[in-house]
């Protein structure tokens, strides 16, 4: 797999000039999408977007992924969660919410559900931190560092929190200090732009992503 790198200027110009779809009808969602796009165009590879609970972070992420992929700004996006239930919830939203011309994100792009199987033909991979730990650090076939060129981290402030609903293989991370260290290892493994979504930025969150 070659590096997912190219001249980003045309994509940045496209995003600047293209209106956000009515799917993201809330002003805070539209402003958040534009803020992330501006930061990326200005060369930032780490962005933190703080949004109050209930303002539609998953809906914002859906609209943002659509624009970033449609513009060819990024080629393969990882949607990273810290627990399986959040990943399942997000995947169902990608499958069911109509975003453009009567189509859902999952109908427009190839999206892979939770799991440790990774296909080079996918556009969006939904995964937990724990499943990536297994694939990157406990596997004979780790992913290349350029496998993803964009990572969107849902509930980024919870990166240190132990998952009380861990599935098989996820309980190998025993304490919060170890989890935070592993969480940072996963994020720093890939040569990718990081976009963190959070309602309440914690100290470790701003240390990783910078201020919102």
Question: What kind of feature is each model-predicted range?
Answer:
Residues 1-76, 85, 89-101, 124, ...:
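ATP-dependent helicase/translocase motor core
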Residues 49, 79-80, 194-196:
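Structural beta-sheet core signal
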Residues 52-54, 82-84, 156, 199-202:
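An acidic- and aromatic-residue-enriched active-site/binding cleft used to recognize and process polar
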Residues 55, 81-85, 106-116, 129-134:
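Conserved helicase motor
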Residues 64, 93, 109-113, 136-140, ...:
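Short beta-alpha junctions and helix-cap segments that line functional grooves
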Residues 80, 126-128, 152:
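Structural motif
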Residues 110-125, 142:
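Conserved motor-coupling elements within RecA-like helicase/translocase cores
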Residues 133-140, 144-212:
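Signature of the SF2 helicase/ATPase Hel1-core->accessory helical subdomain module
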């Amino acid at each position: 797999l070659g590096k997912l790198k190219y001249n980003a200027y045309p994509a940045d110009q496209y995003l600047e000039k293209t209106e956000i779809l009515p799917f993201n009808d809330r002003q805070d969602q539209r402003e958040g999408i534009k803020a992330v796009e501006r930061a990326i165009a200005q060369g930032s590879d780490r962005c933190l977007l703080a949004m109050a609970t209930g303002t539609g972070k998953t809906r914002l992420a859906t609209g943002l992924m659509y624009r970033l992929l449609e513009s060819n700004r990024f080629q393969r996006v990882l949607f990273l969660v810290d627990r399986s239930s959040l990943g399942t919830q997000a995947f169902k939203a990608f499958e069911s919410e109509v975003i453009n011309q009567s189509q859902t994100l999952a109908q427009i792009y190839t999206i892979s559900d939770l799991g440790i199987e990774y296909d080079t033909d996918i556009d969006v991979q939904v995964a937990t931190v724990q499943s990536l730990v297994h694939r990157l650090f406990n596997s004979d076939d780790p992913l290349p560092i350029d496998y993803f060129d964009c990572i969107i981290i849902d509930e980024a402030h919870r990166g240190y929190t132990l998952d009380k609903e861990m599935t098989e293989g996820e309980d190998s991370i025993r304490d919060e200090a170890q989890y935070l260290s592993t969480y940072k290892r996963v994020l720093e493994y890939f040569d990718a732009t990081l976009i963190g979504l959070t309602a309440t930025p914690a100290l470790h969150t701003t240390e990783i992503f910078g201020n919102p």
